[in-house]
Amino acid sequence: MNRLTKKLKELKAENKKALVAYLVAGDPDIESTLSLMKLFIESGVDIIEIGVPFTDPIAEGPIIQKAHDRALQKNVSLSLIFNMIKDFRIEDNETPIVLMGYLNTFISHKDLIKNNEENSIDSILVVDIPGEVNLADYGLESSNVNTISLISPTTKENRIKSIAQNSSGFVYYVTLRGVTGSSNLNIDEISKNIEKIKKYASVPTLAGFGIKSPEDAKLLAKCSDGVIIGSSIVKMIEESSDSREFDRIGQYITEIKQAISWID
């Protein structure tokens, strides 16, 4: 069974919420990314989401855009990312890994996705195509890689149905109107929209974008199957890029994990 599917089933059976942590591969360098992935697991992360650097990351806010720029300056490619993941798999063959990126990158390296040597990755999220589009149409299908689609607060119900049914990993509900890293969570709207998604989805619905504090995470975990933390982690990585001291990130993740583990 695909690692992501297995992990989400286990969490559901244990009545637990999933914690997904995001970082951009190669920011500040590929060695630090590998170290951070290990730190994520030690701090309680269930699933790792790796951003694939791209020249025009239109779905991202300024914090993550800058991380893409820094990684590109280090010539980080999808091939290099796969090699890094293979190194990670030497020590950890259990943690699900999701690649989040843009269509042109994945098409340019479609053999990496299709072959997925040693089952390195578990899912891909292509952010710049409609969620109801089948990745097989782009030659990106793989028997052991499932797909994740985005649904936003402005997505109409007829599209919610088709997008939810097209997702084989989980549905990624974007909690905010705009790009990643925005603020001000409308919990009532989020709760209603996730309820709507769950009518159609056979896979879990996780919430992301705009989660800054353990309190934010706890609120979202009450109405979703898990939370995705991105911009706040990427910001801390940037602030620690000179020293390469990432302990503060581990502490932050631990606090998020504790918050979503105690849902009233």
Regions inferred by a protein language model and the residue ranges of each:
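Alpha/beta catalytic cores of nucleotide-metabolism and tRNA/nucleoside-modifying enzymes
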Residues: 195-203, 212-218, 222-264
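Histidine/lysine/aspartate-rich catalytic loop segments that bind and position anionic ligands
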Residues: 144-181
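Conserved N-terminal beta1-alpha1 strand-loop-helix module at the mouth
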Residues: 1-94, 165, 247-254
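Active-site-adjacent beta->alpha loops and helix N-cap segments on the catalytic face
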Residues: 1-11, 55-64, 73-86, 106-111, ...
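Glycine-rich phosphate-binding active-site loops on the catalytic face of alpha/beta enzymes
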Residues: 45-56, 122-134, 171-181, 223-242
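Catalytic cores of alpha/beta
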Residues: 30-41, 155-166, 207, 211-227
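Hydrophobic faces of well-ordered beta-strands that scaffold small-molecule active sites
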Residues: 19-23, 48-50, 97-101, 124-126, ...
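Short, well-ordered coil/turn segments that N-cap beta-strands
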Residues: 14-19, 44-46, 92-97, 120-122, ...
